[in-house]
Amino acid sequence: MQVTNHETIVVLDFGGQYNQLITRRIRDLGVYSELHSHKLTADELKEMNPIGIIFSGGPNSAYVEGSPKCDPAIYDLGIPILGICYGVQLMTHHFGGKVDKASHREYGKALLNVENQSPLFKGLPIEQTVWMSHGDKIVAPPEGFTVDASNPSCPVAAMSDESRNLYGVQFHPEVRHSEFGNDLLKNFAFDICGAKGDWSMENFIEEEIKKIREQVGDRHVLCALSGGVDSSVVAVLIHKAIGDQLTCMFIDHGLLRKGEAESVMETFTQGFNMNVVKIDASERFLTKLKGVTDPEQKRKIIGNEFIYVFDEESAKLKDKKMDFLAQGTLYTDIIESGTDTAQTIKSHHNVGGLPEDMAFELIEPLNALFKDEVRALGTELGIPDEIVWRQPFPGPGLGIRVLGEITDEKLKIVRESDAILREEIKKAGLDREIWQYFTALPNMRSVGVMGDTRTYDYTVGIRAVTSIDGMTSDWARIPWDVLEIISTRIVNEVEHVNRIVYDITSKPPSTIEWE
């Protein structure tokens, strides 16, 4: 549980798919927000001193025994509460209203009619499009609550009890399909909770530098530098805080993109004047990964080997004892590794792949930030655009973009095909429009014909998505002529490839990475 000096709106997690988006939208307004378990007690919440509380959506029915509930004492704290979807149903059930199964599930865009201009709907149109996703509905609001909005299939689409600062909506204002959703959240944060908006990257830098100095003291930090956005921002931020007390270790695990190792060393040793130690451990990693096909096992092996290499190599730094290991763990990494009400999507390389007996204390200065906030932080720190906007690259590297067993041949295919993809996307001027793009190698071959000869070679998959924060994403609509150029080049320039496929699934149901 984090306690912050910023005015904070706490989101209680009841297991809904959009919970992280609520947190992100509130931060977009300049108000700090955190996602916490619904099991948080009233005393724990009070200790955090939030200016507002949001109950998230969730897949359960509030009237069913055993469904997630919050500490009832939370309602007595006097802090404004906004219930969203399951959150408003939970509030209704608690205060004696009636929630029942809807005759049909309402999912998608719906027209909302605002009947009462409560503070939540201040300045908003009487008719507006919202995003619904629910199988239950409120049949009767609790005593003391006013119905603020409805539609034909949802008689209580919004309700409020202004005297107790309790508000609820059946729709999802955090989803961009709700056309005035951001305005509604702004009304809650500023007009109802009294926020002033004191969350910014400039403030974050000042506070984080102070925290790093207090945590580290006169000791030393070893930073796992990969050259990706996250580790680069971590390195520059910590270097700004403690200077030469930071040593960056760049481990080439043999799973890097084309030209990555050379680029990293040049950028950070010459551009930022940092102490960077390069370790070539590619043979060691690939030996450990030989014959391994399970993606979770691959992640664990890579995570463990990283720490073991750090342990061994830091011991060789005779003049400095390394006490801390810095990581670029993000808020999304922590969320995706599972909460009380959500299943683990995948063990994250910065969260679930660490051995329990490691010899370092962790320092993770970005673990409260989303990816786009990290980019903004990088810009604020003066990091060049080519690094800030570098394609996101996972800690396990190409190890999770080669599905199945990892071999030198497969790595070469992914490395070369990915370089072509990145080159052509940049040529087409799409590199800032597309959130993330890469190639992956499915564990499959297919029949083809090249030069009048039958081939039986690999298929390369292209993944490209648009997103704002990486919590949800849609597949990118790359122009056909650009895709044609990419496909033609890969098949002609990369050996042992005879087929290209394009991944057109969103997140959810898929994750961005294939493993």
Curated annotation (Swiss-Prot):
Q: Which UniProt keywords apply?
A: ATP-binding, Glutamine amidotransferase, GMP biosynthesis, Ligase, Nucleotide-binding, Purine biosynthesis
What residues does ATP bind to?
Answer: 226-232
Q: Which reaction does it catalyse?
A: XMP + L-glutamine + ATP + H2O = GMP + L-glutamate + AMP + diphosphate + 2 H(+)
GO cellular-component term (any):
cytosol
Instruction: Report which superkingdom the organism of origin falls in.
Output: Bacteria
Task: State the top-level EC class.
Answer: ligase
Per UniProt, residues of the Glutamine amidotransferase type-1 domain are: 8-198
Pathway terms, separated by semicolons = Purine metabolism; GMP biosynthesis; GMP from XMP (L-Gln route): step 1/1
Looking up Pfam families in the UniProt record yields: GATase, GMP_synt_C, NAD_synthase
State the active site: 85, 172, 174
Under the heading InterPro entries, the entry gives: Class_I_gatase-like (IPR029062), GATASE (IPR017926), GMP_synth_C (IPR001674), GMP_synth_GATase (IPR004739), GMP_synthase (IPR022955), GMPS_ATP_PPase_dom (IPR025777), NAD/GMP_synthase (IPR022310), Rossmann-like_a/b/a_fold (IPR014729)
Domain GMPS ATP-PPase positions: 199-390
Keyword Cell cycle in the entry? The reply is: no
Annotated GO MF terms: ATP binding; GMP synthase activity
Q: Is Electron transport one of the keywords UniProt gives this record? A: no
What Enzyme Commission number(s) does the record list for this chain? 6.3.5.2
Q: How does it assemble?
A: Homodimer.
Q: What does the function comment of this entry state? A: Catalyzes the synthesis of GMP from XMP.
Protein name as annotated: GMP synthase [glutamine-hydrolyzing]
